[in-house]
Amino acid sequence: MVGYRLKNTVSDNGTVSRGVCQLDSGSLRKVKETLKIKKYPDGRITDTENPAQEVPLDPESVVSMNFWGLPLDFEEMRPIHHLPPELAPEEQKAECLLPVLVDRLITAGRLDVAVLHTDAVWFGVTYQEDRPVVEQALKALHENGTYPPSLKG
């Protein structure tokens, strides 16, 4: 799994979901899918799932952005591969929280996950207001040669 710094993965425009990780000697020991992480203008980052009692989060915490290297034949993934095609409308928009499954397997002793660290800044469009920031970041990556002039091949 690629581990990002929490501070490098949050939006200025609203809450995000991240798998907050606990590590031991470079291995993932626990991952908690945290659904309402909020960054404040002063740099504080909190878990706001319970608004009456926000929980401070360490900006340097390692989080999962769902970059997992799992074998294609990984038997434990079968429930995800075999979702019924006739899902109800509310289920069609449901999110499959892979960190929840991974955490269960780690806890049961059926999975070991090495963590590769990155200091890269994650950017994505979670909110419409994120779009200009992402466009500028992509433009900068093209201009500095990180990305080729065209990604079309």
Residue ranges and their predicted role:
Residues 31, 77-78, 134:
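Residues that scaffold the ATP/ADP-binding catalytic core of kinase and kinase-like folds
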Residues 91-98, 117-125:
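Small/polar glycine-rich anion-binding or flexible loop at a beta-alpha turn
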Residues 1-68:
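Conserved core of the sugar-phosphate nucleotidyltransferase
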Residues 112, 119-153:
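Hydrophobic helical membrane-anchoring modules
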Residues 69, 73, 93-100, 129:
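Conserved active-site and cofactor/substrate-binding residues in soluble primary-metabolism enzymes
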Residues 49-56, 103-118:
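Glycine-rich loop/turn
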Residues 64-78:
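Conserved nucleotide-sugar donor-binding
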Residues 78-110:
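A C-terminal functional module that forms or caps the active site or interfaces directly
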